[in-house]
Amino acid sequence: MAQHAVYFPDAFLTQMREAMPSTLSFDEFISACQRPLRRSIRINTLKISVADFLALIAPYGWSLTPIPWCHEGFWIERDDEEALPLGSTAEHLSGLFYIQEASSMLPVAALFADDNHPQRVMDMAAAPGSKTTQIAARMGNRGAILANEFSASRVKVLHANISRCGIANTALTHFDGRVFGAALPEMFDAILLDAPCSGEGVVRKDPDALKNWSPESNLDIAATQRELLDSAFHALRPGGTLVYSTCTLNRQENEDVCLWLKETYADAVEFLPLGDLFPDADRALTPEGFLHVFPQIYDCEGFFVARLRKMSSLPAMPAPGYKVGAFPFTPLKGREALNVTQAANAVGLLWDENLHLWQREKEVWLFPAEIESLIGKVRFSRLGIKLAESHNKGYRWQHEATIALACPTHAHAFELSAQEAEEWYRGRDIYPQTPPAADDVLVTFQHQPLGLAKRIGARIKNSYPRELVRDGKLFTGNS
């Protein structure tokens, strides 16, 4: 691979020499930082198994190398990368995989390291959604995830990725993460805090990442990280698991933050060693049992991951000062709930007892049952998935619900050709050689739902959301 010029402040290099174990080569660190980052993907097992995905893409000639800490993760090499961006392939558009850096798959692997089954999980700094969607896949779309993002501009991207991946068990919030310890004390079985950091590990992706770096800014960031970790630890139930991670390399934002928590809460904090997380994990293991991943170790981004357990309850933090406001939804029950369920089932939309029906005026929503006890304690930006809008003739089913809930083997499913699927993603109506018999059509490609549509004569009317419509070269080059 060609090298690219990375900007390294002298003080950063001095700090890295001090932080790096003697078993690692500093020259190899510099060399690794200047190599372009390998592309990697994570297969979305909510939609397809790893084996079925590998069989599906076998004709494309993609070279996939397994990522040792993530069964569904692969480094990818493609000869057609310049002609067809990875994000424009049919498999990406339908949510079969997520483009995710390999080392960023580590925190979720650590969160589920004991094959535990948490029912209520918080991702405290969630955008753009790689780890939230990975958590949802590990949970099998059951239970509930509170995905929080402080940056308002990134909440929309977070929702778009959750929707594309067919995830139904998520609630979105837009808060400074420091509120949750007080607002939702000891409410979560597991919490991921992928903390905002100085980003020293991302220089392979962004050669100018360290342009504004300074030792002083590291200390300022670490102070914020301690406050976020304190909040997360208070929001974690006794016996629960917390993973703290960053994409930076200095000790102040990594080991020192975790050791501060241990010093503050003593026996309430137990560090859970990660040396057995995957074969060769011991190469990045610290004396405390954390993983401090320098980029040359596994040829990936620099990363840090710590896993801990909360051993006992803590005194409550002061109550939050904000007002939640009236909750605008009411549960849908009895005959009304039955009518909605039967109408949805008739067009191929199915769900289980993990999701409950709620309504707001003419809108019908599905909320994860596990999140309902948090209603009234925190204000949600978005909760669950919007199932439908009611009107005089029935229900107008929503795109995100179709992607998450549709059964591709339903009697009304209509499989498109590659050329027709490309037309669909361009927002155009479909004129199949043999039109479907049903008026309500579940449009599929590669046996994945693309949307619900109406048949009008010999035409299938396009219902793909306008904001998702694509142009430029699409995926027919793969067919």
Swiss-Prot record:
Q: Where does S-adenosyl-L-methionine bind?
A: 125-131, 149, 176, 194
Sorted alphabetically, which Pfam families does this protein's record hold?
Answer: Methyltr_RsmB-F (PF01189), Methyltr_RsmF_N (PF17125), Methyltranf_PUA (PF13636), YebU_pre-PUA_dom (PF21150)
Note whether Flavoprotein occurs among the keywords.
no
The UniProt entry lists the main location of this chain as: cytoplasm
Origin superkingdom = Bacteria
What this protein catalyses is: cytidine(1407) in 16S rRNA + S-adenosyl-L-methionine = 5-methylcytidine(1407) in 16S rRNA + S-adenosyl-L-homocysteine + H(+)
Q: A Gene Ontology MF term for this entry?
A: RNA binding
Enzyme Commission number(s) from the entry: 2.1.1.178
Residue intervals passing through the bilayer: none
**Cellular component per GO?**
cytoplasm
Q: Where in the cell is it found?
A: Cytoplasm
* GO biological process assignments: rRNA base methylation
Q: Which UniProt keywords apply?
A: Cytoplasm, Methyltransferase, RNA-binding, rRNA processing, S-adenosyl-L-methionine, Transferase
Q: Where is the signal peptide?
A: none
Q: Where is the active site?
A: 247
Q: What protein family does this chain belong to?
A: Belongs to the class I-like SAM-binding methyltransferase superfamily. RsmB/NOP family.
Listed NCBIfam families = nop2p (TIGR00446), PRK11933.1 (NF008898)
Tell me, in a sentence or two, what this protein's role is: Specifically methylates the cytosine at position 1407 (m5C1407) of 16S rRNA.
**Name assigned to this protein:** Ribosomal RNA small subunit methyltransferase F
Task: Tell me the classification of the organism that encodes this protein.
Answer: Bacteria, Pseudomonadati, Pseudomonadota, Gammaproteobacteria, Enterobacterales
